[in-house]
A protein has these predicted regions:
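Charged, glycine-rich intrinsically disordered N-terminal tails and low-complexity linkers that flank
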Residues: 1-65
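Flexible loop/turn segments at secondary-structure boundaries
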Residues: 35, 319-322, 378-382, 411-413, ...
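C-terminal extensions
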Residues: 43, 222-236, 244-249, 255-356, ...
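Catalytic cores of nuclease domains that cleave nucleic-acid phosphodiester backbones
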Residues: 45-134, 291-324
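Short linear loop/turn motifs
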Residues: 72-74, 261, 279-281, 437-449
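Conserved DEDDh/DEDDy metal-dependent 3′-5′ exonuclease domain
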Residues: 89-99, 112-116, 125-173, 177-197, ...
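Acidic, Mg2+-coordinating catalytic module of metal-dependent nucleases/exonucleases
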Residues: 179-223, 229, 426, 430-495
């Protein structure tokens, strides 16, 4: 993978942000094979498009001059800065790395700053420029502060003054001042560390995390690398902090962990008895490729394995970024037979309340039916919808007491030979497949955004298909849990030590 014929390195704000999140990304971007890198997902593309639209809106609302090096009057960033234009949009500055130690084999290093804007602070006679980041988010994030600090650092090389504040414009369009001194102090170290990583002879050792890696284009490569080099890292419950504890105890494989005793692991600093039980059981399940039962399921988290006259499986599609629940899907089951799928869709976000009321009415037609869902999102979203649309607390309580979270049932009742306790991973282990193989929560949000933009009904059909399959996957899991016959439960003292995965 590595190419020793290195070209000069150009460091941008996205490079620094990627390095701050994961040291392996800049290394792979420089040395990795393009065949191992995935194209950005449609959801990532949508986020970029939303940011561009927001930037355009801000530029209209707060006029300035946009950088255009091809303009006959010379609209380069330095030229516009010399003119002290009040607002400069889409700025582009490039400077050599100023006096920082970098590896000798790195070659020339350039810093390329492309802030969304620069704003002149001061009078016509004296002052300085400060950087601007325009983001479509609702709240300030550390990444935005780091990007502003990088732009301020580069500005300091251009105008002989390093601004210690920057402007951040979020979804509401308000211009917020952000203090940058803390991040500015870290920029030189981050740049030096990035240089050391990209010139290293070996790829950085990192620990995958679902929340951090889910949108990374190198995710599949890193997962395959871990599977080949150290499968123990992919075992649920083996975290960044627990992995070195296990290795120091001489446990370097799933098989060794499966054979370890709880008494052996419990005294280890950083583990304890609960984590020890969890890890050993997960290793036993994965090593044997069989479920390991923790306790009987009946009554667990409200779960009743016996078929009910009517059962409902429920799944919500929502865009938390824009605060809209656009599809509430309900699968209706009578006496163990799927009867119907109800797609309660909001083609217009303004119809959300209508969809919510339709769901309440539908669920109240079957007041004794349990409502199966997977994970806490449905409960949390129903609470938000009830508050948003003025649902009586008693009515909401009657609804939520019928909810049965199958994620809780699984993680408290059985250990499975899988890498992740997501609905897709569990259902696929059970042999269930989604009709749209690339579908997912992020793809759902993208489809809804595309529907709003194009009014192409195909996007709504894809949404409904994906949501229905989520409901059917939930029911498939419920069936399996009801049909499976756990052996004798663990002893009472061991049951008390189990913690969810």
């Amino acid at each position: 993978m590595r190419d020793d014929a290195l070209s000069p390195l150009t460091i941008t704000a996205p490079d620094l942000l990627a390095f701050h999140r994961c040291q392996r990304i800049p290394y792979l971007n420089r040395h990795g094979s393009a065949d191992d890198k995935q194209d950005p997902s449609a959801y990532v593309g949508q986020l970029r498009q939303e940011r561009q639209h927001h930037q355009q809106h801000i530029q209209v609302q707060f006029p300035g001059i946009e950088v255009d090096p091809t303009h006959p009057e010379g609209r380069s960033t330095p030229a516009l800065m010399q003119q002290r234009i009040h607002r400069i949009y889409k700025a582009h500055l490039e400077v050599p790395l100023p006096g920082l130690e970098t590896p000798s084999n790195l070659g020339d290093v350039q810093l390329r700053s492309q802030p969304d804007g620069l704003v002149w602070q001061g009078s016509d006679l004296e002052g300085h420029y400060t950087p601007v980041e325009i983001r479509a988010s609702k709240r300030i994030k550390p990444d935005y502060e780091l990007a502003l600090a990088f732009h301020a650092f580069v500005l300091g090389q251009v105008q002989s003054f390093t601004p210690t504040t920057g402007w951040l414009v979020l979804q509401d369009g308000a211009w917020q001042t952000v203090r940058l001194r803390r991040w500015l102090n870290r920029i030189p170290t981050l740049i030096q560390s990035l240089g050391a990583v990209v010139t290293a002879t070996e790829m950085p050792d990192v620990f995958m995390a679902r929340s951090r890696c889910s949108l990374c284009p190198w995710q599949d490569f890193c997962r395959e690398h871990s599977a080949q080099s150290d499968p123990l890292r992919l075992l649920p419950g083996v975290t960044r902090t627990r992995h070195p504890i296990l290795v120091s105890a001489g446990i370097t494989s799933i098989g060794e962990l499966a054979q370890a005793s709880v008494d052996q692991l419990s005294p280890l600093a950083g583990l304890g008895p609960k984590a020890a039980v969890q890890l050993v059981r997960q290793a036993q399940s994965t090593h044997s490729q069989k479920p390991v039962w923790i306790r009987p399921l009946e009554g667990l988290e409200g779960f009743d394995p016996w078929p009910q006259p009517v059962e409902l499986c429920f799944d919500i599609e929502a865009d938390p970024h824009h605060g809209v629940a656009y599809l509430l899907g309900v699968l209706l089951i009578r006496k163990g037979q799927v009867i119907d799928y109800h797609r309660l869709m909001a083609p217009d976000p303004a119809q959300e309340q209508q969809v919510w009321e339709s769901f309440l009415t539908l669920s109240e037609q079957y007041p004794q039916a349990p409502i199966y869902h997977f994970h806490a999102f449905e409960v949390q979203t129903c609470r938000k919808l009830a508050l948003k649309h003025g649902t009586a607390p008693r009515r909401l309580h009657r609804l939520l007491k019928r909810f049965v979270d199958l994620h809780q049932v699984v993680t408290h009742g059985v250990v499975l030979p899988i890498e992740s306790y997501s609905l897709k991973t569990i259902a696929r282990w059970l042999g269930f497949e989604w009709r749209l193989s690339e579908s997912g929560g992020a793809q759902s949000i993208f489809w809804y955004a595309q529907w709003l933009e194009t009014q192409d009904p195909h996007f709504l059909e894809w949404l409904a298909t994906y949501n229905e399959d989520d409901c059917r996957a939930t029911y498939r899991l419920k069936q399996w849990l009801a049909e499976a016959t756990p052996p004798l439960a663990l002893s009472a003292d061991l049951r008390d030590l189990i913690e969810p995965i």
